[in-house]
């Protein structure tokens, strides 16, 4: 029953107080089971049917899908339950205690993005869900901050095909219809060690990597010249060399060298296309030194994402907000949800607060966010 639902600020407080950190380092990684249980119970109190699914390949992580209403289509409101780790020495407040000060709500996940679920739950108090003409779905995912395993698994396994979806990432309530993707790779060169006094008796992995880097930088120039999307502040794919390590002593021929790099592709580019371009760029090194160069993924790749600017969802949301959609350089779960239905990224709070010490959401977002959620439910579920 709706009267069992706690007040807005208490919902928010409980979500922030329930740790759900995602991290690649096992010691820091946490299950989101307790948070999913909180959300599931509250949506059940509102009359929703709730399904909780374990996400394969994770450390006890779960997705939750709450649904109400009958028929095809409808609206999906989606978000992730996890947060990044925090640096205790840089926070001046308890990350797991919601505190309000000077028009700001502080806490880990206030903006990115536990708060979105508090807004949805609180708004639904004022919605007569028994009168919906189309279904309303609420999706809470796992591990967005690391592998995006929750969104990937949901998109691969669900039969749902809503009319549209909104992902409530912090966009300062400015609708986002496109973003770049992200690919990160480790380039490894296996040489042959030996004493530096006789270089011919070894294969110097650093020298081979020097050759490989030249070809990678040529690929970077080719990407910049060949691909453009003027709406982005950086209107071409970027390629960054982020980390390199090789060798162990000045008097030893380097036996191994490893380079970490990333590419941020435009929405029009496929992951297979990018992998092909990278392999082609490195082919001269591989052919000259067979078996000594390998390319491995550091993280599961994320494709670029775009909702067409003339799509009905874009037009409706732009009209409701009185604001044009934007494109951004950071990544979200949108590429995976977009495989099910047209998707926008739109939510309260600023992306500038995400992953920051003393993360906060400004209270000025409370009223317009509630109004927006009511408006999109009315438009997509009652018409």
Swiss-Prot record:
Subunit annotation: Homodimer.
Protein name per UniProt: Acetylornithine deacetylase
Gene that encodes the chain: argE
Enzyme Commission number: 3.5.1.16
Superkingdom classification of source: Bacteria
Reactions that this protein is recorded to catalyse: N(2)-acetyl-L-ornithine + H2O = L-ornithine + acetate
Subcellular location(s) per record: Cytoplasm
Classification lineage: Bacteria, Pseudomonadati, Pseudomonadota, Gammaproteobacteria, Enterobacterales
SUPFAM superfamilies reported in the protein's UniProt record: Bacterial exopeptidase dimerisation domain (SSF55031), Zn-dependent exopeptidases (SSF53187)
Protein source organism: Shigella sonnei (strain Ss046)
Gene Ontology MF, one: acetylornithine deacetylase activity
